[in-house]
């Protein structure tokens, strides 16, 4: 049985969020294909996620964290490390990700748990895992010339690889705010892509 951590980074509900329409469809199809797996839903806007304080930074940078699994910050780090698969559902906001998702990555980027330093630099500790990033964008930022403005999926994908997760897929519904676009078709196309990926994820 695999443990899937489903991280949601949007204050909107499932019906209002175009991202969540896609990610919820992915999760539902995944459950059909993998009924034995455990899905852990983590809605960041329903958690006490905040910017790290000086005291919290000192704690997570301490050498011995083995007895801190219930710490308000480190509990998220250990939860992340213990998962086998990851689903990140996020919109692109202002060319990047919502601040709460960045704060979450600060929570889970902890040496000795998700990565470590060696004489050759940082090495990820989360090997043999996989992730999918589900994203919606108002414009088109995955292809030239505006791909260089994409600090959303590139950041999330890079963080996964920093943790050692090399198998990272991306499902993106783009151009959702472009005048004249058939938004429903673009969302529907992304849902179809999600449905196919869910079966083999």
Curated annotation (Swiss-Prot):
Reaction(s) the record says it catalyses: 2 a quinone + NADH + H(+) = 2 a 1,4-benzosemiquinone + NAD(+); N,N-dimethyl-1,4-phenylenediamine + anthranilate + 2 NAD(+) = 2-(4-dimethylaminophenyl)diazenylbenzoate + 2 NADH + 2 H(+)
Native organism: Coprothermobacter proteolyticus (strain ATCC 35245 / DSM 5265 / OCM 4 / BT)
List of residues binding FMN: 92-95, 136-139
Molecular function in Gene Ontology: electron transfer activity; FMN binding; oxidoreductase activity, acting on NAD(P)H as acceptor; oxidoreductase activity, acting on NAD(P)H, quinone or similar compound as acceptor
Keywords, ordered alphabetically: Flavoprotein, FMN, NAD, Oxidoreductase
EC class: oxidoreductase
Subunit note: Homodimer.
Lineage summary: Bacteria, Pseudomonadati, Coprothermobacterota, Coprothermobacteria, Coprothermobacterales
HAMAP family per record: Azoreductase_type1
Listed name of the protein: FMN-dependent NADH:quinone oxidoreductase
Pfam families with a match to the protein in the record: Flavodoxin_2
Names of required cofactors: FMN
EC code: 1.6.5.-, 1.7.1.17
Gene name of this polypeptide: azoR
Family of this protein: Belongs to the azoreductase type 1 family.
